[in-house]
């Protein structure tokens, strides 16, 4: 590709500054979802709203993450990745500060939706630029290592959020998110390369519809994108629902709630670290299959334990930790293969992939909320297991071609 930035041998400080600044922005948007969740109990109390608004905050945030993906990817193909990405960072800073003016839970939730739009820029623009900037082996390593930094958000978020809410108002969290994003803005402005290949082409809705139609007619791409959504949903549902499950349902403290996040997200990081070590020695296909075993075993353990005893939250945590390790091992390779399953420009493909995933997350978190409200931990984890089974079925379709991901070139 003519816009390749560097090979592994040429990866210098300037080249690395771009992914580091991108992951700082990603971190600020992710911690915007995770750190506020333990604080949501204080938010709903302040606005005199019911606890069912707690997971709805994340639902609104993820719905925002789906809202403009269809436009931003193709737009960045034509006017450039840099200006679109930088505009997204500025939008996040503004909406984080605007939430300080919210007067009720409805306004708060609307602003969470507007903040969530910032997620669109990561997948549709930022990660497309990463994929276009580095060769495959280097790219997968960077993606995995970037994921480790980004995953500190759900690891630290609940711990810091639970502690923060005891000493500082929840509004201060959003000032922190805006400050982190501001730092990433200056770094991206300095280091982000321009990798778009269709700059100057006219953007027409007719052509845009045609492009998406071609992408969505690709059965292998759709299977991969849906699989990524279903396999990640149990983790997102846990982040959204765990304050209610642990603090309200199990009557544990916010400190204990924070500690229960550590094994799950620690396992996720461990899976990513193992992936980074194995990438140059194993095929992408074998890494996905390897990760599939802990994914299914972990979800099965969590479901079986909580169906037998609804309050077996330690077994649930253990099962979700095993599952998270598998996610860390399998997902980066699956993202790569899915993105390149279509020959369409990567901005459009990445946007389509992100929209399908966000649709699954938005609907799925609401379903998981009602599953827990109606059937407790057992139904919540059975729902997670169903998502694992859907992922497994889609993987059979996606990897049906024995050559798919069966070389170190993907």
From Swiss-Prot:
PANTHER family: MAJOR FACILITATOR SUPERFAMILY (PTHR23502), MULTIDRUG TRANSPORTER MDFA (PTHR23502:SF43)
Residue stretches spanning the membrane: 16-36, 53-73, 83-103, 110-130, 145-165, 167-187, 227-247, 256-276, 288-308, 315-335, 347-367, 379-399
The keyword Cell inner membrane is annotated on this UniProt entry: yes
Full protein name: Multidrug transporter MdfA
A Gene Ontology biological process term: response to antibiotic
Principal subcellular localisation of the protein: membrane
GO molecular-function term, one example from the UniProt record: sodium:proton antiporter activity
Taxonomic source organism: Shigella boydii serotype 4 (strain Sb227)
UniProt membrane topology term: Multi-pass membrane protein
Reported function: Efflux pump driven by the proton motive force. Confers resistance to a broad spectrum of chemically unrelated drugs.
A Pfam family hit: MFS_1
Gene3D superfamilies per record: Multidrug resistance protein D
Assembly: Monomer.
Periplasmic topological segments: 37-52, 104-109, 166, 248-255, 309-314, 368-378
Recorded name of the encoding gene: mdfA
Topological domains, Cytoplasmic: 1-15, 74-82, 131-144, 188-226, 277-287, 336-346, 400-410
Classification via InterPro entries: MFS, MFS_dom, MFS_trans_sf, Sugar_transporter_CS
Keywords: Antibiotic resistance, Cell inner membrane, Cell membrane, Membrane, Transmembrane, Transmembrane helix, Transport
Xref: SUPFAM superfamilies: MFS general substrate transporter (SSF103473)
Gene Ontology annotations for the cellular component aspect, listed alphabetically: plasma membrane
UniProt keyword Ribosomal protein present: no
Lineage: Bacteria, Pseudomonadati, Pseudomonadota, Gammaproteobacteria, Enterobacterales
Family label: Belongs to the major facilitator superfamily. MdfA family.
């Amino acid at each position: 590709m003519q816009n390749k930035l560097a090979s592994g041998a040429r990866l210098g400080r300037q080249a690395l500054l771009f992914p580091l600044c991108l992951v700082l922005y990603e971190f600020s948007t992710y911690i915007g979802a995770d750190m506020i969740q333990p604080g949501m109990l204080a938010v709903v109390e302040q606005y005199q709203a019911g606890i069912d608004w707690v997971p709805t905050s994340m639902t609104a945030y993820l719905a925002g993450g789906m809202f403009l993906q269809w436009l931003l990817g193709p737009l960045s193909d034509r006017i450039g990745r840099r200006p679109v990405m930088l505009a997204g960072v500025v939008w996040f800073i503004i909406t984080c500060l605007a939430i300080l003016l919210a007067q009720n839970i409805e306004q708060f939730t609307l602003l969470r939706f507007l903040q969530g739009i910032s997620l669109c820029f990561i997948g549709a623009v930022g990660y497309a630029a990463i994929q276009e900037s580095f060769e495959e082996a280097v790219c997968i390593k960077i993606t995995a290592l970037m994921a480790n930094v980004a995953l500190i958000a759900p690891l630290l978020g609940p711990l810091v959020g639970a502690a923060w809410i005891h000493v500082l108002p929840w509004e201060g969290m959003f000032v922190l998110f805006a400050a982190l994003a501001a730092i990433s803005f200056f770094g991206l402005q300095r280091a982000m390369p321009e990798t778009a290949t269709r700059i100057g082409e006219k953007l027409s809705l007719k052509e845009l519809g045609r492009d998406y139609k071609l992408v969505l007619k690709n059965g292998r791409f759709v299977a991969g994108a849906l699989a990524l959504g279903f396999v990640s949903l149990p983790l997102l549902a846990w982040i959204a629902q765990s304050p209610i499950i642990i603090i309200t349902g199990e009557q544990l403290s916010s400190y204990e709630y924070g500690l229960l996040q550590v094994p799950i997200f620690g396992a996720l990081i461990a899976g990513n670290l193992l992936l980074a070590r194995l990438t140059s020695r194993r095929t992408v296909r074998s890494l996905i299959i390897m990760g599939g075993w802990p994914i299914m075993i972990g979800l099965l353990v969590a479901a079986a334990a909580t169906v037998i005893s609804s309050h077996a939250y330690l077994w649930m945590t253990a099962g979700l930790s095993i599952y998270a390790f598998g996610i860390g091992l399998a997902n980066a390779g699956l993202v790569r293969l899915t993105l390149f399953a279509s020959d369409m420009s990567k901005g459009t493909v990445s946007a389509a992939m992100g929209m399908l995933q966000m649709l699954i997350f938005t609907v799925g978190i609401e379903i998981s909320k009602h599953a827990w409200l109606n059937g407790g931990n057992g139904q919540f984890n059975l729902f997670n297991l169903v998502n694992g089974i859907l992922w497994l079925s889609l993987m059979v379709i996606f990897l049906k071609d024995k050559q798919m991901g069966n070389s170190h070139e993907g």
